[in-house]
Structure formats: structure tokens, C-alpha cells
Amino acid sequence: MSCPSPPQAERNHQRQKVRKTMRIADQWQDFEILDTSSGEKLERWGNTILIRPDPQVIWRPEKGPVWQKADARYNRSSAGGGSWQIYRSHPEFWTIRYRDLRFKISPTGFKHTGLFPEQAVNWDFFREKIETAGRPIRVLNLFAYTGGATLACAAAGASVCHVDASKGMVAWARENQQLSGCLLYTSDAADE
């Protein structure tokens, strides 16, 4: 059985609706995806270029010369985890910014860098809602990782409770808080 396709005018209208609702993090200056191919993405984090696996990249175009500029590549291990293959010397950690926020970046043993830059669209959404609320806002950020959403909400004026089970990630969030100049009061439930 086949369904008739909607007329061209209706398809165009649907596309326009999607475009109006699609959020794009257009304030990045220190992060960009340079290219993608064969299960990998080539990313620029400040002045450092990394190749990381991405299972959603299923197309296989030829990798151009820009891939030769990579400073490091994360290689998965068949036993789980993986490691970074270093092509060029780069810092162990460095700082990037998004709008008025600053973040420590450091490639980890599980392919992450300490930040999910695609979440910036959500940070912008939160900031807009908090800034236009017309009342004090309190936010509970669970599984808060290194604090991107926490810092965005705090920068917009919210009172934020940042929660993550990993002490290492909470410590990293504190570093990001200091880099961004946000005042956060911290405590650890395990210490009380």
C-alpha cells in the first residue's frame, strides 16, 4: 500500500515550520565540527583538532586534507574503552568559551573532552527562559557532568543545585565555575 505524498506547497510549509523551531548554537567561536566521515568526526576545540568516533556518522566520503591537521585521534579498544593516539603535541588541558562561559577541555580515556558542545542550544534556551521569567528561578541540574547547563543557568541569574555522582566531574565543574567567574557554593553529601 502506498500513501499519496503531500503536495509540494504542503511539504514546503512543513519544512518552514521545522526551520522556525530548530535551535542552532551559533555563538560558538572556539568549537566547530570541521568534517565527518566513516564513523568519525573531526572537531576543532580552540586551537586543538581532535578526531573522535561517532556511530551516527554512517556516510563514507573520502577524507580530505583537513584530516591531516588533527592533533590526536581517539581509538576504541575491542576490550572496551580506548586511548588517544597523539599526532602533534598539544596541552593536557585548555580553555574554550561559549558566550560569557569558559570551560576546561581535556581529552579523557573514554573519548570525551569534558563538554558536550551540542548542548549549547539547551543552555541558550534555559538562559532565555530564566532571563525573561520575571521572578527568581531555582534549578536542580541532575547528572550535571562538568556544569555547562549549571553555569548557563547561574549566568542568567538562577539559583542552581548541581548534582553529579562523580566527584571528579563535580571538581571539574568547580574549575569551570571559577573560569566563568560564577559564584557557586558547593558541598558533598558524602562528606556530611
Label each region the model flagged:
Residues E118-T132:
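Conserved alpha-helix/loop element of class I SAM-dependent methyltransferases that forms part
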Residues Q29-E43, L50-P117, D124:
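Non-catalytic substrate-recognition/targeting regions of SAM-dependent transferases
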Residues A173-R174:
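Conserved SAM-binding loop
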Residues T146-G157:
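Conserved SAM-binding loop of SAM-dependent methyltransferases across substrates and taxa
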Residues S159-D164:
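Conserved SAM-binding motif I beta-strand of class I
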Residues P136-L142:
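Conserved class I S-adenosyl-L-methionine
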Residues Y185-A190:
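Conserved small/polar residues in nucleotide/adenosyl-binding loops
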